[in-house]
From Swiss-Prot:
This is NADH-ubiquinone oxidoreductase chain 4L. It catalyses: a ubiquinone + NADH + 5 H(+)(in) = a ubiquinol + NAD(+) + 4 H(+)(out). It comes from Pipistrellus abramus. Keywords: Electron transport, Membrane, Mitochondrion, Mitochondrion inner membrane, NAD, Respiratory chain, Translocase, Transmembrane, Transmembrane helix, Transport, Ubiquinone. Belongs to the complex I subunit 4L family. Core subunit of the mitochondrial membrane respiratory chain NADH dehydrogenase (Complex I) which catalyzes electron transfer from NADH through the respiratory chain, using ubiquinone as an electron acceptor. Part of the enzyme membrane arm which is embedded in the lipid bilayer and involved in proton translocation. The lineage of its organism: Eukaryota, Metazoa, Chordata, Craniata, Vertebrata.
Amino acid sequence: MSLTYFNVMLAFTMSFLGLLMYRSHLMSSLLCLEGLMLSLFVLVTITILITHSTLNSMLPIILLVFAACEAALGLSLLVAVSNTYGLDHVQNLNLLKC
């Protein structure tokens, strides 16, 4: 395992642990999700470059498109919750409350 793979996997693991630990605020959850997507993008890109796989060359671009859509939806949800409740706690997103 090369040092690059180790660093990317460490970034992925730290982002995932951050997503599990800091679930109280929506902004910190969104930042951890962006870290996950960025490390996954780097890992997929490096893997495709090393294996010279031309069939999967569009996969990093598709991953970036999904990451951008996820970021836009997350930020719009953050703005909507902040305008409605005045704070960005994840507990305000419970759909079972009336």
